[in-house]
From Swiss-Prot:
The modification N6-acetyllysine is found at K33. It is found in: Nucleus; Chromosome; Chromosome, Telomere; Endoplasmic reticulum. The record marks C18 as: Formation of an covalent adduct with nitro-fatty acid activators. This is NAD-dependent protein deacylase sirtuin-6. Acetylated at Lys-33. Deacetylation at Lys-33 by SIRT1 promotes homomultimerization and binding to double-strand breaks (DSBs) sites. The active site is at H133. InterPro entries: DHS-like_NAD/FAD-binding_dom, NAD-dep_sirtuin_deacylases, Sirtuin, Ssirtuin_cat_dom. It is an enzyme of class 2 (transferase). Homodimer; binds to nucleosomes and DNA ends as a homodimer. Interacts with RELA; interferes with RELA binding to target DNA. Interacts with SMARCA5; promoting recruitment of SMARCA5/SNF2H to double-strand breaks (DSBs) sites. Interacts with the mTORC2 complex; preventing the ability of SIRT6 to deacetylate FOXO1. Interacts with the CLOCK-BMAL1 complex; recruited by the CLOCK-BMAL1 complex to regulate expression of clock-controlled genes. Interacts with CSNK2A2; preventing CSNK2A2 localization to the nucleus. (Microbial infection) Interacts with Kaposi's sarcoma-associated herpesvirus protein VIRF-1; this interaction prevents SIRT6 deubiquitination by USP10. It comes from Homo sapiens (Human). It comes from the Eukaryota. The keyword RNA-binding applies. The lineage of its organism: Eukaryota, Metazoa, Chordata, Craniata, Vertebrata. Changing K17R: Does not affect acetylation level. There is a cross-link at K170 (Glycyl lysine isopeptide (Lys-Gly) (interchain with G-Cter in ubiquitin)).
Length: 355
């Protein structure tokens, strides 16, 4: 559970702003905003989603900074509540909607701060997923970097040895690698994984639309990745019940339960949310399915006024230029309030926004 995950991290006082009040858009306003989101998704050529702990609360895994989040309750001297374990948690409607959006080619890449493993267990392809803070079900060989996805949590945290050895042989007839396997869960001071960070950074830079779901965007560098889309002329949509660090940069802000927002979005796009039939690990994306017919999106309102601070969508953005291919140095989890350093940031305690 996220409770055990949080307890396993090193002590750290600055965990960001916790327990901020939740905001709910009125039903009519929520509907207008989701229609606008559907237009943006349909008209964009490279859509990247960024997910945080808020997308897993419906599965029984508590978040961290919400009204009843792990760190919010900790600040109040109360014990957090939990309803499930990582092994028994089921992917939510949001998890499965993201699977389908990728299948039909409407989702280019997925960046997650969550460690609960629900994206992988939902069947989302791992080659289109960056898990910046690790995965409770994954261990990696310290020697050859082969990763193993397990059926149960690996049992350690902080990139520690799990007690198992790598069984991969480089060629037929050769002896197994036998490198030491380590968990992939970061502690506050650990550097983000190079591969995942490089992929997330490149995808965010090349996106013409970034959508954040269930994250307060307080942890750097993960929380700043959506801004790379804005800097390259793309659009940013934030879906969260609480205020986020980057609200002022958003073209559209939606305050509603993420499952409700994603369910409405899929309906407007003419897509079904697939049922989950058990854990399924997909290493590489399958050939995309045909896109559904062009949805009959509601016409925009004539008024150019902002919707609760959001900017109405303009003409379709041209795809951003390709990233030059340089890989950023592995930053570390830093405090959410500290200014962005010029050197690779550290994953400081306020950063772990696990699921």
């Amino acid at each position: 559970m996220s409770v055990n995950y949080a307890a396993g991290l090193s002590p750290y006082a600055d965990k960001g702003k916790c327990g901020l009040p939740e905001i709910f858009d009125p039903p009519e306003e929520l509907e207008r905003k989701v229609w606008e989101l559907a237009r943006l998704v349909w008209q964009s050529s490279s859509v990247v989603f960024h997910t945080g702990a808020g997308i897993s609360t419906a599965s029984g895994i508590p978040d961290f900074r919400g009204p009843h989040g792990v760190w919010t309750m900790e600040e109040r001297g109360l014990a957090p509540k939990f309803d499930t374990t990582f092994e028994s948690a089921r992917p939510t409607q949001t998890h499965m909607a993201l699977v389908q959006l990728e299948r039909v080619g409407l989702l280019r890449f997925l960046v997650s701060q969550n460690v609960d493993g629900l994206h992988v267990r939902s069947g989302f392809p791992r080659d289109k997923l960056a898990e910046l803070h690790g995965n409770m079900f994954v261990e990696e060989c310290a020697k050859c970097k082969t990763q193993y996805v397990r059926d149960t949590v690996v049992g350690t945290m902080g990139l520690k040895a799990t007690g198992r050895l790598c069984t991969v042989a480089k060629a037929r007839g050769l002896r197994a690698c036998r490198g030491e396997l380590r968990d992939t869960i970061l502690d506050w001071e650990d550097s983000l994984p190079d591969r995942d960070l490089a992929l997330a950074d490149e995808a965010s830079r090349n996106a013409d639309l970034s959508i954040t779901l269930g994250t307060s965007l307080q942890i750097r560098p993960s929380g700043n990745l959506p801004l790379a889309t804005k800097r390259r002329g793309g659009r940013l949509v934030i879906v969260n019940l609480q205020p986020t660090k980057h609200d002022r940069h958003a073209d559209l802000r939606i305050h509603g339960y993420v499952d409700e927002v994603m369910t409405r979005l899929m309906k407007h796009l003419g897509l079904e949310i697939p049922a989950w039939d058990g854990p399924r690990v997909l290493e590489r994306a399958l050939p995309p399915l045909p896109r559904p017919p062009t949805p009959k999106l509601e016409p925009k309102e004539e008024s150019p006024t902002r919707i609760n601070g959001s900017i109405p969508a303009g003409p379709k953005q041209e795809p951003c230029a390709q990233h030059n291919g340089s890989e950023p140095a592995s930053p570390k989890r830093e405090r959410p309030t500290s200014p962005a350093p010029h050197r690779p940031p550290k994953r400081v305690k306020a950063k772990a926004v696990p699921s």
